[in-house]
A protein has these predicted regions:
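Extracellular structured ligand-interaction cores
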Residues: 104-108, 123, 152-153, 322-323, ...
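Bacterial Sec-dependent N-terminal signal peptides
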Residues: 1-24
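Non-catalytic accessory segments of hydrolases
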Residues: 20-184, 208, 468-481, 489-499, ...
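Serine-hydrolase-like catalytic core of hydrolytic proteins
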Residues: 91-275, 291, 305-340, 492
Length: 542
């Protein structure tokens, strides 16, 4: 490890006194571009570096360009506060950030490390946040890296550009880029962060050859993307995906010409068809016009640079990063009413199935049966969840186990969170909570674990998410899932002492092993893959 410098002995007495009061004192390390100063948390025994820049601010003429290398700095750069999050609206009101404000100048990362002087070779976890590529940031409490660091892991969270700033494509942008493509700037930011990790993580005690990337929802989609991209070859040693893959119908990349047309049409609609006009706008002007358009972001792009083809095509060709994969989804990603748009009655359910699958509705009704109102609720929940995100995640799992010769571990998170500690709150769309609207339609009780609800369990952060009345059972589930994840980051295998055995999925198994994560976690044979095989054909990914 490059020298991690605790401040000079002459001032140690001062800092020791301060540490007794504040539980921290300054600590420095030298990275590629200069010296940074974070804090040493004396209570937790961790070094914390927040708001570390990993690329030039993508502002001015760097708006809508691939991230550019940092210039070196002189002196000591303070890195004790989370950097600003990417520009975004309140898309998911339940997201809670600890960062200070919003800015196009958002390319910062955060590091938690247990390293002592001359520590070397620690495994590394790089976590990408979710939020549909339109919201989120690396400072959310549920992504906090302290628990992982206390397990002997260097934990990193990364900010990346979002919405119009991160994924806008346009013919003029493609023309000016050396690689003749545009869009995907948020994914390129992530890639730049991974390259930064390769250069600098040894300064924090980490081993650049032991980097596992992870994420949930759009963060999981990002993990798929990085595995598929030729730009990330050699940068990762393992991957964890929680509910999401960049495979149709879930935020899959589109052809460059289609993305350019989408961007050009948007630019015309706001009376700024040229790149010069778009770059001349202030951050606020541009974002307000984007927000007024009611667009939910912009698509990722097969730009010939980051993405060279679709994810299924890449994996089938064996061109992906062939690394161990731990991947899964939750038992009730979204409510069944997202599909039925009405009551769980036989008449309504069958009608909706026929509308969605006019040629194959009989097969769908066998796969998602409707023998009673309760069975309809369960089937509608399964179908809604599969169409939303479970199928695409399954497809990723299936591709990697068949075309990588690497171990692939599949899970199903089934723990339903306990009641909220505050009755004035209600669960939000992105895993957190929002104020309850007394006039809102009352949703049925959840029949399984909702989208994003596993994050604080797997990261060991229940104690930081205090909206719920966590029980001993919740902490038991968290300990199990957290240890599986930590073991995987360390070794590429989730198994360890005092944990139920988790077999890797066999390449050709029709009923591959699945770890059901709940109060009593256990591995079982998959019983629902016929659903995914049907959807594979329906979406044309087979």
């Amino acid at each position: 490890m490059k020298k991690i410098k605790l401040l000079l002995a002459a001032v140690c007495t001062f800092f020791a006194a301060a540490a007794q009061t504040n539980n921290s004192f300054p600590v420095q390390t030298k990275i590629d571009n200069g010296i940074i100063e974070g804090n040493y948390d004396t209570k937790e025994g961790l070094q914390l570096y927040f708001g570390v820049p990993f690329a030039k601010p993508p502002v001015g003429n760097l708006r809508w360009k691939a991230p550019q290398p940092l210039d070196n700095w002189k002196g000591v750069l303070p890195t004790k506060k989370f950097g600003p999050r990417a520009v975004q609206g309140i898309v998911f009101g339940d997201m809670k950030s600890r960062s200070e404000g919003l800015s196009e100048d958002c390319l910062y990362l955060n590091v938690w490390t247990p390293a002592k002087h001359d520590t070397k070779g620690l495994p590394v976890l790089v976590y990408f946040y979710g939020g549909g590529f339109v919201a989120g940031d690396g400072a959310e409490p549920r992504y906090d890296g302290a628990a992982m660091a206390k397990k002997g892991i260097v934990a990193v969270t990364v900010n990346y550009r979002l919405n119009i700033f991160g994924f806008f494509a346009h013919p003029e942008l493609s023309k000016e880029a050396a690689y003749k493509g545009s869009g995907n700037y948020g994914l390129l930011d992530q890639n730049a962060a991974l390259k930064w990790v390769q250069k600098n993580i040894a300064a924090f005690g980490g081993d650049p050859s032991k980097v596992t990337i992870a994420g949930e929802s759009a963060g999981s989609i990002s993990v798929t993307a990085q595995m598929a991209s030729p730009l990330s070859k050699g940068l990762i040693a393992g991957a964890i995906g929680e509910s999401g893959a960049s495979i149709n119908p879930t935020l899959a990349p589109v052809p460059l010409a289609e993305a350019e047309k989408t961007g050009f049409d948007f630019a015309k609609s706001i009376n700024a068809p040229t790149l010069a006009q778009l770059r001349a706008m202030t951050t606020q002007e541009l974002y307000e016009l984007y927000n007024a358009s009611k667009r939910f972001g912009f698509p990722t792009v097969i730009d010939g640079y980051f993405y060279t083809k679709t994810v299924p095509e890449t994996f089938k060709a064996g061109e992906q990063s062939k690394v161990p994969l731990l991947v899964g989804w939750n038992s009730a990603e979204i409510p069944g009413m997202a599909f039925t748009q009405g009551p769980f009655t036989d008449e309504n359910y069958v009608k909706k199935v026929k509308e969605a699958y006019p040629k194959d509705f009989e097969e769908v009704l066998k796969l998602y049966p409707h023998g009673s109102d309760k069975e309809i609720e369960l089937s509608a929940t399964a179908l809604a969840s599969d169409r939303f995100i479970a199928y695409s995640t399954w497809k990723w799992f299936d591709l990697q186990r068949k075309y990588s010769n690497q171990p692939v571990y599949r899970y199903m998170f089934s723990r339903v969170r306990p009641p909220l500690a505050d009755n004035s709150l209600t669960p939000g769309l992105a895993g957190g909570t929002v104020k309850k609207d007394p006039n809102a339609f009352k949703m049925p009780e959840p029949v399984g674990a909702a989208h994003a609800s596993e994050i604080e369990y797997c990261m060991g952060n229940l104690y930081l998410v205090n909206d719920y009345a966590w029980t001993d059972d919740d902490y038991k589930v968290s300990e199990t899932m957290f240890n599986y994840f930590a073991n995987f980051v360390k070794t590429g295998n989730p198994n360890g002492k005092d944990l139920p055995n988790w077999p890797a999925a066999l390449k050709d198994a029709t009923d591959p092993d699945v770890m059901i994560i709940n109060v009593e976690s256990k591995a079982v044979k998959a019983t629902d893959d016929a659903r995914y095989i049907f959807l594979d054909k329906a979406y044309g990914n087979n």
